[in-house]
Amino acid sequence: MTIKPLIILPDPVLRQQSKLIEQVDAEVLRLADDMLETMYDAPGIGLAAIQIGVPRRMLVIDVAREGEEKTPVVFINPEILKVSDDISTYEEGCLSIPDYYAEVERPASLTVQYVGRDGKQQTVEADGLLATCLQHEIDHLNGVLFIDHISRLKRDMVIKKFTKAARAKI
């Protein structure tokens, strides 16, 4: 397993559409392991493949609380089948937008269909933090960032801040 460098805003890679994974093979499983290692190292609770520069429809999530046993799940080609009408608000952050957090409203629960590590199709019904994390990470697969769900003024300020920081590194 290898810790991969994270793609940081304003890198345009984050706005790419990720492509379907045709087959769960050794390369895909290695990518999943690298993603988990990278996520835990960051540390974070979710990571989409695009965040390490791989435009494939895969994400990893572990919403276990600190001190609890790890419960990593690999979601390949996740697809939202159903969302609730109820809305919940969570303060979200993102490994690709370090040290910035904002309140985001999303459906409180949802049903997601995906392919697991074993190559078999599965379905999960999620609510709470898992539902929010799934929506956040699936957004990444579609080139959407959590800052796209906040006010335009706040989003523009965040993008300006990260663009300025990126220029300073050049």
Swiss-Prot record:
Gene3D superfamilies: Peptide deformylase. Fe cation binds at C94, H136, H140. InterPro entries: Peptide_deformylase, Peptide_deformylase_sf. Keywords: Hydrolase, Iron, Metal-binding, Protein biosynthesis. GO terms for molecular function: metal ion binding; peptide deformylase activity. NCBIfam families: pept_deformyl, PRK00150.1-3. The keyword Signal does not apply. GO terms for biological process: co-translational protein modification; translation. It catalyses: N-terminal N-formyl-L-methionyl-[peptide] + H2O = N-terminal L-methionyl-[peptide] + formate. Belongs to the polypeptide deformylase family. Removes the formyl group from the N-terminal Met of newly synthesized proteins. Requires at least a dipeptide for an efficient rate of reaction. N-terminal L-methionine is a prerequisite for activity but the enzyme has broad specificity at other positions. The active site is at E137. This is Peptide deformylase. Its cofactor is Fe(2+). Binds 1 Fe(2+) ion.
